[in-house]
Swiss-Prot record:
InterPro entries: Hwtx-2-like (IPR012625). This is U4-theraphotoxin-Hhn1a. GO terms for molecular function: toxin activity. Expressed by the venom gland.
Amino acid sequence: MKVTLIAILTCAAVLVLRTTAAEELEAESQLMEVGMPDTELAAVDEERLFECSVSCEIEKEGNKDCKKKKCKGGWKCKFNMCVKV
């Protein structure tokens, strides 16, 4: 009776561990597929750099400081560029 119980518990533990490992692998593969290609990220960075430098230049011509709030989404304006915060 004890041997059967130990065998059942061992099989259950192995099954749980294999299922958990399979779920982790599936989650990792999905994370790798979701990301943006590097070329798209570079284009976004260039757009943010341009937007920030233009907005800073407009503010400087009016003898005002650059508005730090122009860059959004985790970016801030620094040295006439959008910098990731």
